[in-house]
């Protein structure tokens, strides 16, 4: 960022830079590796699924809070999962897409909180939820706090059962 963070223009420039970093959270090498396996990235999958220009993302600037095992040095925006809503053939849906290019798509505390948030949104809005799974499982570096979100996710799966459609796409490794 080259602008003055103490000015409105500088703050806007800083926000734009952060949002751009969130879009490219996975390293170039990780993206190339994903593509070499014939797989799309999380955002590419969303863009291929929803109507063009309809996706609204939330919490793209969320980052993990862990300081164990040197994790404070690697805090990518989005924390490895993209969440939001869009339309498919004009029908509104909520969705999450796990990003294998960011920490192997591993589920940590913030990652799980984001999935829970979009699940709650889908249930409240009464719209289908689509989960695109491509994950290395629990983010073990975060210890037991990475396991708690699984229970919250499963609780919401049960609460949503028979109320809203829940669709899971397994497009890579998946735990659970």
Short names for language-model regions:
Residues 1-167, 173-175:
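Terminal-region recognition feature
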């Amino acid at each position: 960022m080259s602008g003055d963070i103490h000015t409105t223009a500088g703050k806007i420039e800083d926000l734009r830079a952060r949002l751009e970093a969130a879009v490219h959270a996975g390293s170039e090498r990780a993206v190339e590796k994903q593509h070499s396996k014939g797989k799309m990235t999380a955002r590419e999958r969303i863009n291929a699924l929803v109507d063009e220009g309809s996706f609204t993302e939330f919490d793209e600037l969320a980052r993990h809070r862990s300081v164990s095992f040197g994790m404070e040095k690697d805090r990518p925006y989005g924390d490895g999962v993209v969440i939001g809503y869009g339309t498919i053939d004009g029908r509104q849906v909520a969705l999450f897409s796990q990003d294998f290019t960011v920490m192997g798509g591993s589920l940590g505390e913030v990652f799980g909180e984001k999935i829970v948030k979009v699940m709650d949104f889908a249930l409240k809005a009464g719209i289908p939820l689509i989960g695109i799974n491509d994950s290395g499982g629990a983010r073990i570096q975060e210890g037991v706090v990475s396991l708690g979100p699984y229970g919250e996710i499963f609780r919401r799966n049960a609460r949503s059962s028979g109320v809203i459609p829940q669709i899971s796409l397994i497009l890579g490794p998946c735990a659970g």
